[in-house]
A protein has these predicted regions:
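Structured, helix-rich domain cores that form ligand/interaction pockets
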Residues: 2-336, 352-385
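Helix-turn-helix DNA-binding segment
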Residues: 340-345
Length: 385
């Protein structure tokens, strides 16, 4: 019965670099009894990955390593991307032009501004990259002089975790040179337009997890098929919750696989990243002030991360729900149940499988601490009120 459980969804199959497998938004997916008994459908370690010369190639580690569910451990939460707007006070146009001219020339300071154009000038008239010399590594995007007067005069965007403390230090030097010593005070009265919070969990892959929201949201599940021993094995590489165009969008994805495909580098073991893109707002829908960051809702709080429950011999309907969750995601599988009481019962059963390491409050506090450590903001705004 369960071995014949199938579901057809739409196809999309761009090839990936790692093997002869490919991404699919869906396919005909067979779920065998092992799926219900909480056995992940990982590719076997056997190497039958063949290149264009019909030669066997070693499989990338993210396909061959086994998850260690009992040993899974999260790193500290961090900010993966930050975008803010603010209006500096007491800065005259002549001084700003002089500062931009001076910083636009490569110099001994170790950084410089590169003028951008094109699509970057649609909202702001001037856009610059802050680049680190000796390789021209991108550190931040800086925009100014908006076309609409209701916008703040300055907008910047950076990735604190990628550029590190040294990179953030250089960005602060640019801000001081352009906007003066009190830029942190002015920034506190600005707005946070985007904040991406993330936490990496090691020794586990997304295929071992269910991800769903505490409230009704659009969700998706993206799988990768891998041809091994003459049959296709499906591995979940990404869970999504929310819409890209909304104020809230979450992803739980295989970071090791992404690093392999994008950078052709091997990650240090299995890494699953839980990442939330948030546009912080107040209760009345206004964009959140930087100084009120402590009042921002915890983006991890609306997210449930759980293991697949062990099947019960008597509750075959719940077993079918778990099997369906592997095919279409827990959120959509729950919506297939029309009876609210039954749906609520099963939702609570799924919540019982949340691992001890998933701690939304702790992860969010770590994200705020990482922002505080950058020194980009006044320390007062991080005090608990």
């Amino acid at each position: 019965m369960l071995a014949d459980f199938t579901r057809r969804v739409s196809r999309k199959t761009p090839e990936t670099r790692a093997s002869k497998g490919f991404w699919r938004f869906g396919s005909r997916i067979q779920v065998d009894i092992n799926t219900v008994n909480n056995v992940s459908s990982h590719p076997v370690v056997e190497n039958n990955n063949v290149n264009e010369n019909s030669e066997n190639e070693p499989l990338p580690p993210f396909l061959t390593l086994s998850s260690q569910i009992d040993s899974a451990v999260p790193d500290s939460g961090f900010c993966d991307k930050l975008s803010c707007t603010f209006t500096p006070t007491g800065i005259c146009d002549d001084r700003l032009r002089e500062g931009l001219s001076m910083l636009s020339e490569p110099n001994a300071r170790g950084y410089y501004l590169k003028r951008l154009g094109g699509k970057n000038d649609r909202i702001y008239r001037q856009s610059f990259e802050i680049l680190k010399m000796g390789g021209e590594r991108h550190m931040a995007l800086l925009q100014m002089n908006p076309r609409r007067t209701e916008h703040h005069f300055i907008r910047f965007e950076l990735n604190p975790s990628e550029i590190g403390m040294d990179g953030v230090y250089e960005v602060k030097r640019v801000f001081k040179a352009l906007f003066g010593e009190r830029f942190k005070v002015d920034l506190s009265d600005g707005n946070i337009t985007r904040l991406d919070a993330a936490v990496d969990v090691r020794k586990i892959r997304p295929d071992d997890l269910m991800v769903f929201s505490t409230s009704a949201r659009q969700s998706g599940l993206f799988q990768r098929s891998f041809d091994t021993s003459g049959h296709e094995t499906f591995v979940t590489e990404t869970h999504t919750v929310g819409s890209l165009s909304s104020d809230y969008f979450a992803r739980c994805y295989d970071k090791a696989a992404q690093v392999w495909r994008v950078k052709a580098e091997e990650a240090d073991g299995l890494i699953t990243r839980v990442e939330v893109k948030l546009k912080p707002r107040t209760e009345d829908g206004a964009t959140l002030r930087v100084g009120d960051i402590r009042n921002a809702r915890n983006p991890f709080g609306a997210l449930m991360v759980a293991y697949y429950p062990t099947s019960g011999e008597s509750n075959y309907v719940f077993n079918l729900l778990v099997a369906a969750a592997r095919s279409v995601g827990a959120e959509r599988a729950l919506k297939m149940i029309p009876d609210r009481r039954v749906r609520a019962k099963y939702w609570n059963l799924l919540r019982d499988s949340v691992p001890n390491w998933w701690c939304p409050e702790k992860h969010w506090d770590e994200v705020l601490e990482s922002l505080k450590a950058t020194g980009l903001f006044s320390r007062d705004i991080f005090r608990k009120k």
